[in-house]
Amino acid sequence: MSGKQPDAGPPPIQLWTRDGFQGALSAVTRSTYAPEYLSVEGPHAPRRAVLERLTPDDRDDPDALPTMIATSRQGVRLHVSARRKPMPYVVRNVEADEIHFIRIGTVRFETDVGCLTASAGDFVCIPRAVAYRYAPIGEAMHSVIVESPAALKLAPPLPSGLLNTARDLKFAEIDPDMPVGGPTRLVLKTFDAENTVFTLPHDPLALGMRLSDSVPVWKLNLAAIQVHAYLPEGGPPSQFLASTTGDVLMFNLSARPGGRPPVHINADFDEVICYVGGPGAWGGCTEPGTLTCVPKGVIHHGPSEDVPEGYQAWLLETRATLRWTPKALAVAELMETGQYLPHPSVSK
């Protein structure tokens, strides 16, 4: 069995929706609890992983790239990084925009449009073909990286309310004191099995002055993104970021007042949630850095988000069909889709 059937009361509503909650919708009730399942075989199954149980390659090997934990035919991918030393090379991702979410630590990013320092809770946007490197300030850092082949941009439902970009959006700034240095490796990151590496005579991130107003590299803290609440019954969260094609959406899924979400069949989007941390628990997610994934078409309910103690989490929705990599599967568990606990069959 899976999850916990709600206590006495009316049967939970079951929704089937297209385009997230923006398209066609069907609502029904049923006498049984739809998210329950006895077992599952195959890759299209709900899973969860505590990221602290996975050691990224770049933690102990400065030359390594971040470790991929999920991939897709469409090119949407997830990685984790835990560097303890600076990158000894520069990367230019020529296939995808990247969003780096800093879970732990403080990280300095140097790019060929400027530098910024990001702290725990910050999202850092590095668009396609912007060269960069990063390093922890201190002994440790941990980040989750989302790759999107389509361009990413801030896309709140209204110009004001969810975001205060004038106050909270911070852009990379040129460091005029960065030395030009000597020979530097530039890794062009592509979908090929082997990356292309140029050796340059100087550091490509050493800049002179800015001549344009536009700065494509920015940071925004999760705590600065407002939650969208519907009282008393509750309703879907509002996106703060989207790809230009609508294939990738990101939401603040932190604690908010309102009713528990309905039982849901999301016809078009895989749902990946990162539980950042408490003090409150989000259902079965109590360990910071717990990552959950419910593939499209899998019936789920999900925990209540009305947690008085408070917690932080974010949601990634993607039309891409994600598949966990072997390294991620080694630390992942089958998940029930009621409270997002490990499925009971895991302990048998």
Regions found by a protein language model. Give the residues of each.
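Jelly-roll (double-stranded beta-helix
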Residues: M1-K348
